[in-house]
């Protein structure tokens, strides 16, 4: 029973953890591609070989081109939510926690996968119309 209990069994928890890790990998890949586009960097031409990249392609988040992967419109929207969450959280931390700017990234890298729309809205309201994060990067606007 402890192994296969539907919600609290070892197997259920393992599956839940694997699903979470997969989602984080996919979101990180989307955000990475978005940041590459933002900075004008060359796309990773070998990126299509990875399982995550293939999954994103099959699910319509990215397309393969000669020079690598590009975000589809839906992939771009999803990536912007992740990058926006990250940069909003860095900005909030920069205002409220006594951390050097170079220490803001690691906690934001984790929390970006957990900020829901309601929490993002609360942070936005508290920050006002903040356009730039503490590193000087533009915070993407939310698309309606």
Question: Language-model segments: which ranges?
Answer:
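Short helix-to-turn junction characteristic of helix-turn-helix DNA-binding domains
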Residues: 33-37
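Structured cytosolic domains appended to multi-pass membrane proteins
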Residues: 39-144
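Membrane-interfacial segments at transmembrane helix termini in multi-pass membrane proteins
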Residues: 1-32, 117-138
